[in-house]
Structures are given as structure tokens and as C-alpha cells.
């Protein structure tokens, strides 16, 4: 109900609403995930700010494990992805990158909302 949605919004559970763009309908056929290795921890602020300026980078996460940052990129095709890597990512002074190309998104969903105490 609208009252419930308003309550969830007021609690900060719902942050807003957005349109979901079909990347293939707007010409972006390639979805890639990239693990980024930084040369030094001091690069985090400058690299994340630079990544915000690259429109094809749609997500950026600080991670544990082998990568310093993990990003999601949409590109028109594999050649465009290569161009993004060479012309936009390499100039950031990264130690190295690892790419994973997604063939197809199997599913995507939001986490379930359970506001009841589980005590």
C-alpha cells in the first residue's frame, strides 16, 4: 500500500525509485566486471573519483580479497570495451586489471524486506 511505501521511505529502507534501462536497447551489448589492482592504497580517493567520470562504469565496490576495487562496465561491444580499458582505465595508473565478461544476466533482484524482529 502507499502508506507502507511511505513508511519504508521515511525509515530510509527505500532510497528512491529509478528507471531500469535495457542496455541492449540503447546499444550496449557487452557487460563486463573488472577487478582493479591499485599501485598503492593512497590511490583509492583519486581512482574512485576518476571512475565516477567514466559513464560506462555503472558500479564500483571496495572489496576484500584479491582486488582493491571491483567495477561493472557496459560497452557497445568488445572493441569498445578494449578502448575503455586502454583510453580510460589504464591512464588511472592501475597496477593491473582482470576482466570477466558476462554472457547473459540470469536474474537480478532486490533483497527481501522483513521489518519484523527475529528475536
Give each language-model segment a name:
Residues 1-119:
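A compositional/biophysical signature of low hydrophobicity enriched in polar/charged and small residues
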Amino acid at each position: 500500500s502507499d502508506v507502507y511505501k511511505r513508511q519504508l521511505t521515511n525509515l530510509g529502507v527505500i532510497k528512491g525509485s529509478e528507471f531500469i534501462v535495457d542496455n541492449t536497447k540503447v546499444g550496449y551489448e557487452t557487460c563486463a566486471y573488472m577487478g582493479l589492482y591499485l599501485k598503492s592504497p593512497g590511490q583509492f580517493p583519486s581512482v574512485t573519483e576518476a571512475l565516477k567520470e567514466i559513464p560506462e562504469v555503472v558500479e564500483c565496490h571496495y572489496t576484500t580479497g584479491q582486488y582493491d576495487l571491483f567495477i561493472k562496465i557496459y560497452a557497445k561491444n568488445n572493441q569498445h570495451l578494449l578502448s575503455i580499458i586502454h583510453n580510460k582505465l589504464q591512464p588511472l595508473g592501475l597496477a593491473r586489471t582482470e576482466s570477466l565478461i558476462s554472457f547473459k544476466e540470469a536474474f537480478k533482484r532486490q533483497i527481501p524486506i522483513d521489518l519484523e524482529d527475529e528475536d
